[in-house]
């Protein structure tokens, strides 16, 4: 089925079999991001094996996540769910004493209809630790949506200003920027900001990237009131009705919906700060929302592109095919088209056209400016059909999930794991180089092998 959008982008929906990680993998980066948390995944042995393989076995460190393994007694309702979870949570409290316990529901808890949302408030009151329930199960479209589910649950837990005596104390980034300064200096610095409604940014990013984006907005006179998630659960941002929110990742549509509907926030619809072009447009949209004239962004973007010139020479004219895995595909395709690459197809497990509207508009604009034909966006791609198209098109690079990387390499097609873009620092002006470092690695390897004369794999 083909749908032609008003901006002439072609959308196809194949509803086929595609491969992506399980969303419970979000625990891998969220437990590191929220330092005072403990993640309890409630599932079967399969979930436990997956977590061990996906995150590695930590021998010397005690990780802040665990597996509550469902047994036959749980599934046949012979055991009391409440008592079993209470026993585990009391053990976690005794050993780790976290500020929050996050229960991660799985496919099995969905199938046996475990009422985690009903159990959590009673247990929370009994043990005295907040319990957040997130259904990050394999019924989702992509593994990154696990983070979306957790952040949507946490958005409902963000305090209001009436419940907090000093909201500024809950802003760790602001405290970091003001560290070592006298009170008078802090007050003088706060006068540099333009008057605007409070702004909260949502999306889990490494701390250096959080600081970079906060400083980029500070240069424009925009103060970030907080980030969701914060580094600590006790520092979740204050969110009141009428606050403005902006996302930094394309897979956070549930969180955006929760902030709009339940917390009555205003969503700033903007492309995502991936690549110099996306970062500039993201900042411009936030400035435009607050009626602020952006300063020096064109120069900042031009300077970044200049620093990328060595990589741009490598990728210009090369073709890339996205099989679809982590919902970053539209943003990455738009950036690579701006770099001079040819995008043959954008496969994506799920497309929220409202949340990604600004990103799709920027993709169309980028194609027009670069003289690139509008790529076809295939939602829920059928991997079998994709493999036939890859065989016919012979792209220089395929960005794919792990399942297809080795089979494609065996057929002489260069691949890059899409999961690497999830874990790499790809946001902001300064990190565009990291994206191109990942993209060009297979291309540079091919060049090096060709230089050695090793162009064919010979089987004996």
Swiss-Prot record:
GO terms for biological process: light-independent chlorophyll biosynthetic process; photosynthesis, dark reaction. Coiled coil: none annotated. Its EC number is 1.3.7.7. Pfam families: Oxidored_nitro. It catalyses: chlorophyllide a + oxidized 2[4Fe-4S]-[ferredoxin] + 2 ADP + 2 phosphate = protochlorophyllide a + reduced 2[4Fe-4S]-[ferredoxin] + 2 ATP + 2 H2O. Its cofactor is [4Fe-4S] cluster. Keywords: 4Fe-4S, ATP-binding, Chlorophyll biosynthesis, Iron, Iron-sulfur, Metal-binding, Nucleotide-binding, Oxidoreductase, Photosynthesis. The keyword Nucleotide-binding applies. Binds 1 [4Fe-4S] cluster per heterodimer. The cluster is bound at the heterodimer interface by residues from both subunits. InterPro entries: LIPOR_BchN/ChlN (IPR050293), Nase/OxRdtase_comp1 (IPR000510), Protochl_reductN (IPR005970). [4Fe-4S] cluster binds at residues 22, 47, 107. Pathway: Porphyrin-containing compound metabolism; chlorophyll biosynthesis (light-independent). Protochlorophyllide reductase is composed of three subunits; ChlL, ChlN and ChlB. Forms a heterotetramer of two ChlB and two ChlN subunits. NCBIfam families: DPOR_bchN, PRK02842.1. HAMAP family: ChlN_BchN (MF_00352). Belongs to the BchN/ChlN family. Component of the dark-operative protochlorophyllide reductase (DPOR) that uses Mg-ATP and reduced ferredoxin to reduce ring D of protochlorophyllide (Pchlide) to form chlorophyllide a (Chlide). This reaction is light-independent. The NB-protein (ChlN-ChlB) is the catalytic component of the complex. This is Light-independent protochlorophyllide reductase subunit N. It comes from Thermosynechococcus vestitus (strain NIES-2133 / IAM M-273 / BP-1).
